[in-house]
């Protein structure tokens, strides 16, 4: 069994050997060189992700859009651990790349946007959206918003759009803090 090191996608060894050179993971978009050997298929889903999913769905059912007050705090906690540079979005992107959350994150400082590719949470986020849960738990979005708020003094509205094997996250100023 081969398993994608980014998103956990699994493919049997026999099928892997038949893949063409240009093949990319259907879930996160990395090349086949990012698939690793595994003695046996993963049994079930990662328990921590199941717990996180249950908390997210529960928050959404109870609070709806109000759950964003809780999930924004997640970004603030992560922002406390980021080395801030001249470019707050790049600082946040570098942190997530360094910790293996995504294969690449490009930043557009002028338009306050992140383009996250090969996200390790992509499949998780898509499953939440398919279940009707507005995704407010994105660590990239919440952390980048917290870093921007700290450096500019403004609050930001977050908008996420689907990109190629990830999301494009845009931030728009809404008010002074």
Swiss-Prot record:
Single GO term (MF): iron ion binding
Residues involved in Fe cation binding: 4, 7, 25, 28
Binding note for cofactor: Binds 1 Fe(3+) ion per subunit.
Annotated keywords: Electron transport, Iron, Metal-binding, Transport
UniProt-recorded name of the protein: Putative rubredoxin
Cofactor: Fe(3+)
SS bond list: none
Superkingdom in the source lineage: Archaea
Domain Rubredoxin-like stretches: 1-38
Transport in keyword set: yes
Family as reported in the entry's similarity comment: Belongs to the rubredoxin family.
